[in-house]
Every structure is written in structure tokens, then in C-alpha cells.
Amino acid sequence: MDNYRRLHTPVALCVASPPAPPTTSWKSMEGLVQCSANHVPLSPITFLERSSKAYRDNTSLVYGSVRYTWAQTHHRCLKLASALTTHFGISPGDVVATFSYNIPEIYELHFAVPMAGGILCTLNARNDSAMVSTLLAHSEAKLIFVEPQLLETARAALDLLAQKDIKPPTLVLLTDSESFTSSSYDHYNHLLANGSDDFEIRRPKNECDPISINYTSGTTARPKAVVYSHRGAYLNSIATVLLHGMGTRSVYLWSVPMFHCNGWCFPWGAAAQGATNICIRKVSPKAIFDNIHLHKVTHFGAAPTVLNMIVNSPEGNLHTPLPHKVEVMTGGSPPPPKVIARMEEMGFQVNHIYGLTETHGPATNCVCKPEWDALQPEERYALKARQGLNHLAMEEMDVRDPVSMESVRADGTTIGEVMFRGNTVMSGYFKDLKATEEAFEGGWFRTGDLGVKHEDGYIQLKDRKKDVVISGGENVSTVEVETVLYSHEAVLEAAVVARPDKLWGETPCAFVTLKEGFDNGVSADQIIKFCRDRLPHYMAPKTVVFEELPKTSTGKIQKYILKEKAKAMGSLS
């Protein structure tokens, strides 16, 4: 596909000039060569190949009554890759889409598609038919694998494509159910039955070849197509499982959607370590606790909103203390210190990370220091809520002035833009060179997140650029206001956005969901007073709205929807 070939054409994206090459390099040292003996393109495909031998009979995946070993998973992926090429004619650079929740077939497609030379495009299972249609057209997918529960949405999406005279992708059902045997669609299990495990893997010729497309999560109205490389996926997979403390005996619960940042690269990372994957379609506190007890889950990932569900669930009282230590990797938005504290009281060990779709998921890690244990709980958990240091595979991270590109002072108060530079930054936005150039301007990836740098080098997010409330000329960090709101005993969830104001320009408007039992016992005035007692008055919300908060599939609150609601309220003054 010509669009993907262009990904390998050098483009001058960075304004800053690269450093001059050293006067002496390995190429000028006599007797050294680079050849196939010492240079092989990196690809996470190799993780599965190794695990099929090293951990042959170990359990690779469990889903209800379904259970596979690593040898079986490797066998199935080879047969599927074979069928993709022989049955559908998938060629290197072709896009294969998926539309499903976390089931075994989606895990297998993370290997089978790149084994066939294809590019995996995992679509958000909560998208409606219009969005699915738009993303299929944009990605130019040749195939789409769909689970039966989402078939009607997928059909409607394909119909929309046909109405626009766009050739729709071939639909493959992810089922072996007898009720679908008479359907006109290809079936996943039929492909497996007709595939060959003698298939010769189509390895990337260049480790920077695309392995997947991930559309941004939808906290903005127009998702972008982020392209991951084999190299970036390989490096971030290893770094993530190492920093999460995962090994051969680890049991990983799939609470992070695999359609989001390829599940933070854990499909490939779990294979690298030969860990066991536990798949679940629906995430709930009950499902998490049940699997911890049933399958001895040792690790899982979740957005702070899921942690908030856990600590406020009756299930927590029934199942804690936990029977063994469970490591939780959380990211997506700054977690309230109070939530981290309660999680650890229940027996979870919280590992706070921060990243974006554009950084293959995790890009930082809040490394906990032994001396923090001696601090008062409030101070200790505030430190753990920071975003921390650069991730193991991310070479550089900084907080910089977005205009001068100078590093801000490490004083914990000077605000700048969080920026990254490294091998796990995306290749770019597919079909959007302008956005790619803007994101990489100055030789760094600009996140759009505002933060500070502390004396110890740890960074801490203050807000998204677009979320800062400017009231009377003062910048109000919505994250700081939300942290105070979460400390109120009645508040389950909170989000702060700007409400237009004729006098002040903008004022903070808080959308709040109350805990069960507090529905009629707390007023907006009480919430406002609580905040004014703990914040400068200009930072305290002037408006409080009680309602359920809209979220993405990964649990991130959709502030753009709340902003529209606040805008519709008009001026408070």
C-alpha cells in the first residue's frame, strides 16, 4: 500500500538540527561490519516463537472453559497467518482490523497479523457504526474480525461504506457457534482449520515497519491514527513487563482493552515472559476479585476510574485482605492519592504510570522509594500519585517551555509542557503529515500535557493545555481541584471544566457523581465550601452539577462532552 510505503521515506520533521556525527564511529573502525549475523530487525513476533519452546506446556491463555498452552497458541497463530495469506491474499502492508472485546482470538491476532506481514488495527468495541465506518475507510482495512455481539454494528458500518461507493473490508466472525454456521461470513475457526502450521513467517525487512494502527481514545472529537513500529512494540513490551515485575509465574488479568494502545503492549510482553493471560469481556470489581481468587491473578492494569470502582465496591469488603500480593499498573489520568491509599490498604500494590497512545502506552513510571514509607500517609500517597521518571524504554523525558524549548526549573512549581524523545514514540499520524510535524516540532514529541519537574527529577502533571481554566487571568489546574473533590467523603467521581463567564472569562465548573447513600445528603453549596476551605478561592468551583460522568472505553472521563454542557449553561455572572 503506497500510504505505508511513504512511512519509510525520510522526512525532515524536526526543527532542531540533529547533533553533528562523531568524528569516529564504528564504521571507521577496522574489522567491523554490520550484517545478518549481528543485526536482525526487532519484532515482538519472536517472543511467541521463543515461548512456544521455552514454556511449551505452560498455560498461555484462559477464557472461561477455554485454555491453551504456549505451544498451542503458537500453532494457532501460525495457522491463522497462513489462512490470512492464502485465503484472503493479505500482503505486507495490508491492514487487518478487529472489532471486539478481550477474547482469545484478539490476543492471537496480535501475533498472526504481523506474522502474515499485515498491520493490525484494533477498533474500539464501543464505537458506533458511523465511527467504525469512518475508521475503516481511513485505515483502508482489507479484513475486519468481528465478535458476534457486535455484528449488527459492524454490518451497519459496512453498509455505510457501500453507500459511499467505498469497497468494504471482508468480514470474519470470531465464533465457532453452531448458530452462525449457515451465515454468509467467513469464520475464525474455519480459517484455523484450513491454515498450515508450516507457514513461513513474513518478518519485517525493517524494524521500523508498521506493526499496528491505534486510533486515539476519543477524549477529543476526532481520533487520530497513531502508527506503531515493530521496534517500538518490541522495546516497550519488554520494558513494561520488567517494570511491572512480571515473570514466567505471573498471571495477567486482561482488564485493559486490547484495542487501546494494543493493551499497553502487554499481549507481546506477556509472551516474552511466558506469563498466563486471563481474558474477560467485561470489567467489574466482582470480575477482578473473582479472577484473583480463581486464577491467582498477580497483575492487571486499569485506569484510575476502575480503581475508584474497586475501592467503593461492596466486593472489596468481601474479598479483602487479598490472598496474595496483586500488582496494579494504573494510568490514563492522575489517580487521586486517596484512591491509591485505599487500594494499598486492601492489599494491592499500585504502580503508577503515564503515557499516551503516541508513546505505545506507558512512557513513565513512578518508582517508589524506600524512604517514602516513613512519611505520613497523606504525603506518601501524594508522592505516589506523581507521574515519575521516564519509562525503561523511553530515552528522554522533560518538562520544557513550549516556545523557547528550554527545560523548566526543577522547583515543583514552574509549569511547562511534558515532552518525550525515544524509540517508543510513534512513527507518526497516518495520512496526517501536518499533525505529525506539529507533534515533533523542535525534535521532541509534544504531549499537550502541562506539568512541573521536582527536585528529584520526577514530573507531575498539572493539566492538559486545553483543560486549564483561565479565571480572571489566573490559570486553574483542574487536576488540583479534582484531587480536592475526591477527598470529600461523598464524592465518587469528579471532573472540572471551564464555564464561560462575562466577568472572569471562565470559572471552574465541577461535575460530580456521589457515592451511594449520599444522593440527597450533599448540596452544591457544601461541595463549593469544602473546596474553598482547601484551595485559593479563585480555584474553587463556582458551579457544581451532580450527574454520571461520560467515559471512554478505557475509563477516561470525556471532558469535551462536559465542556459543551458547561458552555451551554452560559455565564454565571
Swiss-Prot record:
GO CC, one annotated term:
cytosol
Q: Where in this chain does the entry annotate a coiled-coil region?
A: none
Does the keyword section mention DNA damage? no
Tell me the Pfam families matching this sequence: AMP-binding, AMP-binding_C
Q: What is its EC number?
A: 6.2.1.-
UniProt-annotated location(s): Cytoplasm, Cytosol
Where is the stretch described as SBD1?
284-352
Q: Sorted alphabetically, which InterPro entries does this protein's record hold?
A: AMP-bd_C, AMP-bd_C_sf, AMP-dep_synth/lig_dom, ANL_N_sf
Per UniProt, ATP binds at: 216-224, 352-357, 449, 461-464, 556
User: What are the UniProt keywords, alphabetically?
Assistant: ATP-binding, Cytoplasm, Ligase, Nucleotide-binding
Q: What class of enzyme is it?
A: ligase
| Ligase found in the keyword field | yes
Q: Where is this region: SBD2?
A: 353-429
Superkingdom in the source lineage: Eukaryota
GO molecular function terms noted in the UniProt entry: ATP binding; CoA-ligase activity
Task: Name the family.
Answer: Belongs to the ATP-dependent AMP-binding enzyme family.
> Domain description from the entry?
Both substrate-binding domains (SBD1 and SBD2) are involved in the substrate recognition, and are sufficient to confer the substrate specificity.
Q: What is this protein called?
A: Probable CoA ligase CCL13
Q: What is the organism field in this record? A: Humulus lupulus
Print the organism lineage.
Eukaryota, Viridiplantae, Streptophyta, Embryophyta, Tracheophyta
